[in-house]
Amino acid sequence: MVPEAELEQTNAGLVPASAGWFVLNARDARWFHRPGRDSLPLTGCDEFEAETYFRMLGMSLQVLSPGEPNSMYHWETEQEDFLVLFGEALLIVEGQERPLRRWDFVHCPPETRHVFVGAGDGPCVIVAASSRQFQKDGPWGYYTVDEAARRYNACSEEETQDSDVAYAHVPPSQPSRYREGLLPD
């Protein structure tokens, strides 16, 4: 029998504190905020939760303001999949720009270079899922330089595997509580 995980109340919201199954409402969970972008790593962040990090699957909610990227242009060694739940976004994939709207699904096989940028006149909500099966065997991927991504401040200044280098020009995300109105009703 699989036990229920303990949820720990932190200053920024609830986080899983042990292994096991759990139910967690996104509005009660700990988010990470930086200007223009909020994210909820539903399955843990390896740099923050070594004990409860999900080793096989990564999943997050990302809320983007218009013009704000969800990450820096990159590729990963694992498959990644995305679903636009609300609003509009611009996908930059392999140097091409593709507009996205609610319910658009994006599949990125391993090594697909990509980034999302909020679009339209309001926030965009994206659910992101990725395999983590092979990341233990070597590098997770790479931040790459791309002219289309650069136009949206969505790429590193240089090719690198170092996230500190890739994100040097943006403020770091900080743990935060859910902000009212962030998610649609």
Enumerate the predicted regions with their spans.
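Conserved short histidine dyad/triad with adjacent acidic residue
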Residues: P41-E47, S60-E76, P110
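Short acidic-glycine-tyrosine-enriched beta hairpin
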Residues: D81, G95-E111
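Short, conserved beta-strand element in jelly-roll/cupin
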Residues: M56, L61-P66, H74-I92, S130-S131
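Extended, acidic-biased charged interface segments
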Residues: V125-Q135, V145-D146, A168-V170, Q174, ...
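Surface-exposed, gly/pro-biased binding rims or lids
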Residues: S131-Q161
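A short, N-terminal "cap"/entry segment at the start of jelly-roll beta-barrel domains
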Residues: M1-M56, R150-D185
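Ligand-binding loop in jelly-roll beta-barrel domains
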Residues: L90, P110-D137
